[in-house]
Amino acid sequence: MSSGSNSGGLMSSAGLVRYFDSEDRDAIAIDPKTVLAFCVLFGVFVQILSLTVA
């Protein structure tokens, strides 16, 4: 095994680290509990609609 074959993984992941680093500074921070509550409420809303329509 040559050392050149292992360097490709590090080079490709370095760009991803830089990309996600810049995304974190500008991203809107939403609490995971808020997302979960929205999903549960949306599911309840869909169930109520399916009961009233059918």
From Swiss-Prot:
Extracellular side: 54
GO CC terms in record: plasma membrane
Transmembrane intervals: 32-53
GO BP terms in the entry: protein transport
Keywords assigned: Cell membrane, Membrane, Protein transport, Translocation, Transmembrane, Transmembrane helix, Transport
Subcellular location: Cell membrane
Gene for this chain: secG
Domain of life of the native organism: Archaea
UniProt-listed NCBIfam families: PRK01253.1
Signal sequence coordinates: none
Assembly and interaction partners: Component of the protein translocase complex. Heterotrimer consisting of alpha (SecY), beta (SecG) and gamma (SecE) subunits. Can form oligomers of the heterotrimer.
Coiled-coil regions listed in the entry: none
Cytoplasmic side, ranges: 1-31
Topology with respect to the bilayer: Single-pass membrane protein
Protein name listed in UniProt: Preprotein translocase subunit SecG
Family to which this protein belongs: Belongs to the SEC61-beta family.
Functional summary from the UniProt entry: Involved in protein export. The function of the beta subunit is unknown, but it may be involved in stabilization of the trimeric complex.
